[in-house]
C-alpha cells in the first residue's frame, strides 16, 4: 500500500507555502508537525472551506485552519478497517504513525481502493450476476 503521497510542513508555516508544497508533491494533504510529531492535517477540503472564500487566509499559519490532533492509524491496520474508518468519519486521508507518534505516511482512500482492486482477478470482477447465465454476446468494460 502506497503511503508516500503526502507533504509535511512544520507548524507556523503560512497556508500559501503549505499549498505550494502540496502542489509540488502532487497531493491533496499536508501533515503539520512539531519536532517530527504530527500535530495536525491540512487537506484540500480545509482549503476550499476556509481559504477559497477568504483569500487573506493564505497568509495565516496552517495551525489556524488545519484539523488539530487528527485521528491516526498504525501500519498494521487492515485495508477494510481503514476504509470503514474513512467512511464512518468522512475522511479521505488517514495519517499513519508508529507507536511513538512518528509519521510513516498518509493513507488515502484511493490508495486503499487501488490496493484492494489489484488483489482481485479480472475474471472475478467481470462475472455475471447469475453464474448460470450465458450472455449472447461478449460484454466488457
State the predicted function of each range.
Residues 1-5, 43-74, 78-88, 106-141:
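Tandem CBS (Bateman) regulatory domains
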Residues 5-8, 37-38, 72, 102:
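Short, flexible active-site loop motifs that bind/organize anionic cofactors or intermediates
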Residues 8-26, 33, 72-90, 97, ...:
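The conserved cystathionine-beta-synthase
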Residues 22-25, 30-46, 86, 94-110:
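A glycine-centered beta-loop-beta connector
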